Amino acid sequence: MRALNSRLVLIDINSSWQASRRLISATATAFSSDSSSSFRRTRGARQRIASSKSPASSPSPVRRPSDGFSFDVRSPSSDSSISSRKSPTTAPPTVELDAFLEILPPATRKELVKHEAIEELIEVVMDLGRKPLARFPSGDWVISEQPVTHQDLELAVSKVGDFSDDNRSGIDRSLHRISAIRNRKLQVIGLTCRVGRVVSGSAEIIRDLIEGGGSILVIGSPGVGKTTLIREIARMLADEHRKRVVIVDTSNEIGGDGDVPHSGIGRARRMQVPNVNLQHDVMIEAVENHMPETIIIDEIGTELEALAASTIAQRGVQLVATAHGMTIDNIIKNPSLQILIGGIESVTLGDEEARKRKVQKTILERKGPPTFTCAVEMISRTECRVHQRLDVTVDAILAGKSAPFEIRQIRGEDDVPHKLVTPIPLENLEEEPAPLLNRDFVSELLSDDEDEDFLLIRSNKARSNTYTSPRSSPVHVYTYNVLEADLLQVAEVMGLDDEIEVTDDVGEADVILASSSELKQNSSIRRVAKLHKLPIFVIKSTTMAQMVKAVRMILGRESFGSAPKAIEKSSVDDIEIKDDAPESKPSLEELDALEEVRLAIEYIVIPGGEPVELLPRRSDIIVRQLELVESYQLAVENLGTHLNPRLQILPRRSTKKTLTSSSPQKSADGSMGTTGTRLPFLKD
């Protein structure tokens, strides 16, 4: 206490920077030169440097807390003044903000304290010759119009610890991180001073994963809160679950700077890394020497560290680690970190296996089990994507499918003393409406999540509940990576050219026809389709058979010659196009026979206009061949005998609904098979 203007002012030392803001302006001005704390660390022969140029005649010293003092948000009853300020909904973060502000120049500190969002400060950037910046969740804020000088940087450097090989330092027994930028002469010309926080309850969003005992990989961009999350995970495992937790703290960011770890990690032990290039050695040493049940690792970034993490996982130790990247897909594409998800290898499949999977013969597969059992993608400090099984997610991504995940958010409510964790079901997620796209813009955004040869993804159409074929007006088709001429020529061959019309405007289209070869890793076309309520037809190739099936399904026909079947738009299930092969598992002889028909039609009959005689087959296989020929609407003759039947495919259009080998009919000229005019052929 001291007398000011004949009044008594009681000062709260623990939050002097906050109290001074609540006083009247005259009192704050008179007290500003004396209320700042003097947190300094002494290492070796380092001398204490005054934080401001105050005159020699100073008031009597005020008793201050020790350098390592910090209040624990999990024990609100320990300090009545802190409890009185605590919000009833969320626990305030542990921030030694006095110690952080002390390293700043006096003028910068004075201006920064006046900011209304000082409690949400993220970091302060000081570059030589530039204005100092303060970064808040709302954006950057210029602290002072005066540029940073060499003296300002030297003052800040003198109040922090020694910088490590990666140019990082900190304040003793605090979580703040100070990173330096040096010139060619190794002189400090810039500082990034990041505020470290212990946010109690930040790990509640993934409590089920923590209690499950599996290894957790936390992925996110810099500054999204990965370190804060794993620090709270370490405390929960050590204090609540009574596990032996060892933290491999490379940059002293998890446990704070200095030899005594910060209280924010609870009972967990902390191992410092003398050389950042030897982090993998310290990881192995922690397992061999200290018998941990859980190891916490921050920033796995090299192949050696990834290999060490994989080794630790095979020894039965739970791992919790972070890695830089927006999604798991970034980890898969990072050659140094691929081992964390099991590694990637190229596999060549046999013909039968490739047909069974309906994929090409050379594919990418996961090499082995992933190091981590689950993964958390940090979207923001209050939202994340959770992958319960990392192996399933990786397999889905490699197969070109949509990876299963769950989105979780932290939502605060007034009547609840803690933050609520609210899982959001995937089916209830609403995608952002996408803008109306033109053809050039769509070409940059399309993706493919399916591995079927032909898959229809339908959504409700506002204009009508159903559509049938034939229609009074033609179906407008928007094509992507499918030649309009090919589609129109196929429709003309089928005699349906009056029922299909190609358009370049998505807004006028009734359906979208796209090639799956261009639909990779992006769902923008699906958002466009959902916005306009359009069904999407995805064909894997632009072969004759695929185009014919596309036209049939676009017009709502189950098969040629049958009555049109309406496609109910209100249905929530996707319509999957059946393969040409039979539903039962075919034999190798059947596969060879069907492949013989396909090759004959697509490479000889249609392009060259020549008939092709097939090899003799069993009667049941002949039936399968006839069904396949019918899908191309071509005529066929039976040239064999009853005991040795064989077919000949003719380059003429079939007019029969069905054709069987037991009931051939003669044409007007006496030849076997059906008659029809010669068809125009598709271009090669």
From Swiss-Prot:
Disrupted gene: resulting phenotype? Answer: Albino seedlings with defects in etioplast and amyloplast development leading to degenerate organelle-like structures, but normal green vegetative tissues. Reduced hypocotyl gravitropism probably due to the lack of amyloplasts.
GO molecular-function term, one example from the UniProt record: ATP binding
Superkingdom of the organism of origin: Eukaryota
SUPFAM superfamilies reported in the protein's UniProt record: P-loop containing nucleoside triphosphate hydrolases
Per UniProt, subcellular location reads as: Plastid, Chloroplast membrane; Plastid, Chloroplast envelope
The UniProt entry lists membrane topology as: Peripheral membrane protein
Q: Which GO terms describe its cellular component?
A: chloroplast; chloroplast envelope; chloroplast intermembrane space; chloroplast membrane
Q: Where exactly is the transit peptide annotated in this entry?
A: 1-78
- Supply the alphabetized keyword list: ATP-binding, Chloroplast, Developmental protein, Membrane, Nucleotide-binding, Plastid, Transit peptide
Q: Which residues bind ATP?
A: G220, S221, P222, G223, V224, G225, K226, T227
In which residue ranges is the amino acid composition biased (Low complexity)? 50-88, 657-667
Concerning CDD domains, the annotation shows: AAA (cd00009), R3H_AAA (cd02645)
Disordered as annotated region, ranges: 33-91, 651-684
Q: Which Pfam families match?
A: Spore_III_AA
**InterPro entries this protein is in?**
AAA+_ATPase, P-loop_NTPase, R3H_AAA, Spore_III_AA_AAA+_ATPase
- The primary site where this protein sits is plastid
The task this protein performs is described as:
Required during eoplast (a highly reduced plastid type present during the degreening and dehydration stages of seed maturation) development in embryos and early stages of eoplast redifferentiation during seedling growth.
Homology family: Belongs to the ycf45 family.
The name of this protein is Protein SEEDLING PLASTID DEVELOPMENT 1
Q: Which organism is it from?
A: Arabidopsis thaliana (Mouse-ear cress)
Which lineage is the organism of this entry classified under, starting from the top rank?
Eukaryota, Viridiplantae, Streptophyta, Embryophyta, Tracheophyta
Its encoding gene is what? SPD1
